[in-house]
């Protein structure tokens, strides 16, 4: 049985609230007993028998709920065993892909970059507007911003109010579509950095305690759990107190997201582990949302209050337009 099937079955069972069913059933049956008990018509011992039956019904509901919980626990154990292979396969696949990045012939390298840029999360216009509104709620020129893999996403336009604005990706070709959205003057203000996929000291070029907002949209869908957790650790260091990480990832607590992993369209990153890791690091969960497809949006906040010593908006350091800094 596939892991996606195990998780789908577990999630379906979790939707059943046996305690709620038992509560309503007991109250309905109690109404029946009350009607019988308060009637002047009392043939034989039906009232006593019905009261005893009601107690038995409650016990049976408790037993049924316990059996269901036992089944869910057994499924959790089966998932824990099965997911070890998914973690390993995701890591191996990522390591193979990242070790080859930029090291093949020019045409193949260009094709790989284009494939990465063409990856899109499908969104309804309503979802796109909702996410834009949430991003815009964090925009303030007093604070710096970072976008990891800006790609072709329209969200880059929402972040121009952050000063300075850092853009990071694996190579210049991946940054070009985002940079080209702006005029020459603003392009020169962007802080561009190259960070190879094999880098272990991620985001080392970004100053600590500087970012008011970090956006990673449609990036962690293509990283295994250890890479994602490494980014969480380092982004936390880069955020100012009160700063926010807004991110999407392939939430494998959802069965259809696990199915993407089984088709090698994504990597295995369960939401329960991602959120537990974030909590351990020190993040506070601000907001989470998912649609009926593959998008899971998560906002994590570094504790503290945002403050700034800036007295007026200043220009970022001028950088060459065509070449990004390389670590």
Model-based region annotation:
Residues 2-205, 223-229, 244-327:
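Class I (Rossmann-like) S-adenosyl-L-methionine-dependent methyltransferase catalytic domain
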Residues 142, 210-212:
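Local beta-strand N-terminus motif with an aromatic residue
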Residues 201-205, 211, 236:
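A generic structured-segment signal
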Residues 215:
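A conserved beta-strand element that flanks and buttresses the S-adenosyl-L-methionine
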Residues 219:
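Hydrophobic adenine-recognition pocket in adenosine-nucleotide-binding enzymes
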Residues 229-241:
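A short glycine-rich, Lys/Arg-flanked "PGG" loop and its adjoining helix->strand segment in the class I
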């Amino acid at each position: 049985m596939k892991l996606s099937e195990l998780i789908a079955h577990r999630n379906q069972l979790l939707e059943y609230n046996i305690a709620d069913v038992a509560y309503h059933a007991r109250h309905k049956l109690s109404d029946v007993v009350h009607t019988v008990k308060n009637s002047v018509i009392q043939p034989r011992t039906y009232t006593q028998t019905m009261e005893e039956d009601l107690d038995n019904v409650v016990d049976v509901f408790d037993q049924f709920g316990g059996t269901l919980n036992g089944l869910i626990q057994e499924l959790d154990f089966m998932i824990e065993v099965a997911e070890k292979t998914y973690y390993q396969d995701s890591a191996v696949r990522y390591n193979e892909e990242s070790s080859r990045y930029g090291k093949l012939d020019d045409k193949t390298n260009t094709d790989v970059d284009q494939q990465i840029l063409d990856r899109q999360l499908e969104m309804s216009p309503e979802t796109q507007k909702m996410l834009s509104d949430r991003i815009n709620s964090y925009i303030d020129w007093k604070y710096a911003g970072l976008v990891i893999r800006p790609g072709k996403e329209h969200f880059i336009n929402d972040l121009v109010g952050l000063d300075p604005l850092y853009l990071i990706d694996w190579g210049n070709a991946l940054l070009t579509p985002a940079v080209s959205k702006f005029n020459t003057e603003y392009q020169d203000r962007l802080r561009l950095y190259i960070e190879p996929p094999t880098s272990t000291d991620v985001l080392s070029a970004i100053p600590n305690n500087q970012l008011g907002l970090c956006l990673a949209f449609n990036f962690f869908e293509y990283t295994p759990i250890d890479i994602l957790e490494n980014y969480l650790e380092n982004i936390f260091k880069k955020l100012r107190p009160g700063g926010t990480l807004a991110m999407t990832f392939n939430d494998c607590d959802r069965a259809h997201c696990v199915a993407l992993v089984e088709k090698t369209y994504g990597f295995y990153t369960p939401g329960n582990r991602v959120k537990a890791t974030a909590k351990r690091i020190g993040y506070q969960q601000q907001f989470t949302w998912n649609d009926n497809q593959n998008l899971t949006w998560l906002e994590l906040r570094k504790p503290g209050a945002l403050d700034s010593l800036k007295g007026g908006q200043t220009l970022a350091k001028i950088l060459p337009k065509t070449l990004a800094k390389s670590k």
